[in-house]
């Protein structure tokens, strides 16, 4: 079973607007986000990644590109990796939303919440888990490494799903822009190797890097 590298897209300027992005298209990486993406590509260039999947939203595709280029892989867009459908909340002011009566439910009991005209967290978690499980079935060799580039809440929801954590606790996890979370999935369960890591990723030193450094044994 594979090692999943769950990567959050790089920084963008939309966050400065103070609005909830949801599935908004047309959000591109800013200068810092581009540097984060390039750092990911450099850090993963010697890791034998078999495939790279990405949310089709621009901020994710642009983050995946340096990794794909370094590994000479084609990015596989996966619609089910899009961020949560927040319905009529998309593009709304977070400052205003935080003062709504339901905001405490979003933060403390998300399993009970559905975005107006959008998804529930239960539905979005199931969507992400289904997408990852399809990838796992396709890349089922023990040494396969798969990179998956998408969004913060989806990554936290996926980790919660595979580790059997209550959905209501997923907001306790951290997932910064340009970070990597490593999850090893086997028939007996899942192990969280790293959470919210920034380059370099020394724990991923694989055969290709060892060979470059002259450390392989005959």
Model regions and ranges:
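Short beta-strand scaffold positions
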Residues: 54-55, 126, 149-150
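Short, hydrophobic/glycine-enriched beta-strand segments
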Residues: 3-9, 148
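Acidic, low-complexity terminal tails and accessory targeting/binding regions
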Residues: 1-2, 84-95, 137, 141-144, ...
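Short active-site segment of divalent metal-dependent hydrolases/proteases
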Residues: 12, 154-155
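Active-site signature of alpha/beta-hydrolase-fold catalytic machinery across serine-
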Residues: 66, 157, 161
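Active-site-proximal alpha-helix that buttresses catalytic centers in soluble enzyme cores
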Residues: 8, 13-73, 77
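Phosphate-handling substructures
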Residues: 14, 70-129, 184, 193-197, ...
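Generic structural signal for well-ordered alpha-helical scaffold segments
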Residues: 38-42, 125, 129-137, 159
């Amino acid at each position: 079973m594979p090692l999943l590298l769950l990567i959050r897209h790089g920084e963008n300027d939309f966050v400065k607007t103070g609005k909830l992005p949801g599935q908004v298209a047309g959000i591109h990486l800013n200068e810092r986000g581009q540097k984060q993406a390039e750092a990911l590509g450099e850090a993963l260039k010697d890791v034998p990644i078999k495939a790279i999947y990405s949310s089709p939203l621009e901020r994710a595709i642009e983050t995946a590109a340096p990794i794909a280029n370094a590994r000479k892989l084609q990015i596989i867009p996966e619609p089910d990796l899009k961020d949560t459908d927040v319905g009529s909340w998309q593009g709304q002011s977070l400052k205003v939303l935080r003062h709504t009566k339901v905001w405490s439910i979003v933060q403390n009991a998300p399993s009970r919440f559905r975005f107006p005209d959008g998804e529930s967290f239960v539905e979005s978690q199931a969507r992400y888990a289904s997408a990852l499980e399809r990838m796992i079935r396709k890349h089922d060799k023990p040494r396969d490494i798969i990179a998956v580039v998408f969004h913060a809440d989806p990554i936290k929801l996926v980790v919660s799903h595979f580790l059997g954590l209550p959905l209501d606790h997923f907001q306790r996890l951290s997932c910064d822009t340009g970070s990597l979370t490593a999850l090893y999935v086997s028939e007996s369960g899942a192990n969280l190797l790293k959470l919210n890591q920034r380059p370099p990723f020394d724990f991923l030193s694989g055969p290709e890097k060892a060979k470059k450094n002259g450390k392989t044994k005959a």
